A protein has these predicted regions:
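N-terminal beta1-alpha1 cap of cysteine-dependent amidohydrolase-like domains
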Residues: 1-91, 102, 107-109, 113-147, ...
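Conserved G/P- and acidic residue-centered "switch" motifs that form tight phosphate/ATP-binding loops
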Residues: 94
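Hydrophobic, aromatic-enriched interface-forming segments
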Residues: 97-100
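Active-site-proximal beta-strand elements of phosphoester/diester hydrolases
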Residues: 192-195
Length: 221
């Protein structure tokens, strides 16, 4: 909507109960203000939301694309690039991971039907968003491994997926159907994206709490 901006409460509570102070950053059309955001905050969390505008990763819209907002996309991509040029930590969730990938010149499958091979249903139908849907396998060399171990069961609420990871991004977790479930920046101190929603599993999963605590600790340092 043009007249409101919001963040779902689980993101806010997950930051708060991990020792951080949540600050909501509204969409603005000012590069000067973006630089002030960078100075103001110690770490950045990019949340879930709408699909990414296909033109921003070099494609025209295909069947299955959902709602998009190019103004928000461009704002978040500019902010992401600023953060990655600094040493400040960034944790990106679902759409946030897709923004992370797009900002680094990666590409997307506009709908998971376009991914080669047989895919899982990544839009789970359970009543509770904390319910798990499928396992992910985590790379031992990744930062995620120190928080989550070799594998973890996650929830799943997405229909888009990363096709080609962006420049300097490495894949750190995969689903059983080889969908990319997490990425990390190879040279940034703390830049992680996950496709699932750890904020919805925060109360039920110690591993997800460790993930948020790792982000907040990086911001505090």
């Amino acid at each position: 909507s043009d007249n409101r901006q919001f963040v779902s409460n689980p993101y806010i509570q997950s930051v708060r109960y991990s020792g951080g102070i949540p600050i909501l950053l509204p969409l603005i059309r000012s590069d000067t203000m973006l630089e002030q955001y960078l100075r103001l905050c110690d770490g950045f969390l990019f949340c879930g939301g709408n699909d990414i505008t296909p033109l921003l990763f070099g494609q025209e819209p295909r069947e299955g694309i959902g709602n998009t907002n190019i103004t928000l996309d461009l704002f978040q991509i500019r902010l992401m690039k600023l953060i990655l040029s600094s040493a400040k930590p960034v944790f990106s969730i679902c759409r946030g991971m897709q923004i992370f990938n797009t900002a680094c010149q990666g590409t997307m499958f506009q709908d998971i039907r376009y991914q080669p091979g047989e895919s899982l249903d990544h839009m789970q139908r359970s009543d509770s968003r904390s319910d798990v849907s499928h396992p992910v396998r985590i790379e031992r060399s990744s930062r995620l491994f120190s928080c989550l171990g070799r594998s973890v069961y996650v929830n799943s609420f997405h229909h888009q997926a990363i096709d080609r990871p962006g420049v300097d991004l490495k894949v750190s977790a995969l689903a059983p159907d080889q969908t990319i479930e997490a990425i990390e920046h190879s040279s940034h101190p703390f830049a992680i994206g996950v496709q699932w929603h750890p904020e919805c599993m925060f109360r039920s999963s110690e591993k997800m709490r460790r993930l948020f605590r790792g982000f907040i600790t990086a911001a505090q340092n």
